Amino acid sequence: MPRIPGVNHQDAVRALRKAGFQIIRQGKHIVMSDGTRQVTIPRHNPIKAVTMGGIARDAGLTPEEFRKLL
């Protein structure tokens, strides 16, 4: 699994917005969608590296593409 260490949940939301995702709902987790894919971001800091890698993969991004969006 790709690793993207030390990412704040707010930075992750900002990066996914740049990738075309919109917030669907918020609570203890933030659910975002681009119309075809849906990702869930936990609302704690920092997000674990393995978890963030999985979120990037679910969003259809490589770790390098995600880092560029940060």
Give short role names for the model-derived ranges.
Residues 18, 22-53, 57-58:
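A short, structured beta-strand/loop element
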